[in-house]
Amino acid sequence: MTEVFLPSFNTGNFSKGAGIIKQTLWYFANALFVLASWNPFMGIKIFFLRLFGAKIGKGLVIKNNVNIKFPWKLTLGNHVWLGENAWIDNLDEVIIGNNVCISQGALLLTGNHDYTLSTFNYRNAPIIIEDGAWIGAKTVVCPGVKVKSHAILTVG
């Protein structure tokens, strides 16, 4: 097995999908309005997510402390629920269908590293969650997973 040498880390062909100005503006908008626990107003959160490129259907319920890394890589269907402390770490696309519940503390993780390379490159893949699925509290969804319609993922 190849020995990992972290100083040689290489992002490979990874793209954040936005320029540095957009990324910086999102960082502050997210911290002040979307991720902020003081803001109970879903309309403000939805406004900023759409402003930064998220495709959002009607009826989104987004609770406090929901962290979304790159809204421009996010598609949400109709009547999606995002519970408290959910984290969408979307280095790649995340597509969530209609009537999907992402419960408290769930982690959607589209990125990882290739430990077989000394450069520890990213190994990213999209996540697709089909209509009617439920991602239970504290559940981790890994890169490349496709959650089928009306499936239930839980910890345990």
What residue ranges belong to the model's regions?
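Terminal amphipathic alpha-helical/low-complexity segments used for targeting or macromolecular assembly
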Residues: 1-54, 58, 132
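Left-handed beta-helix
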Residues: 58, 63-64, 69-70, 77-78, ...
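Short, charged N-terminal helix-start/capping segments
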Residues: 1-21, 62-85
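Extended, positively charged loop/linker patches that create polyanion-binding surfaces
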Residues: 120-122
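A short acidic, helix-capping loop that chelates divalent metal ions and anchors anionic groups
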Residues: 115-118
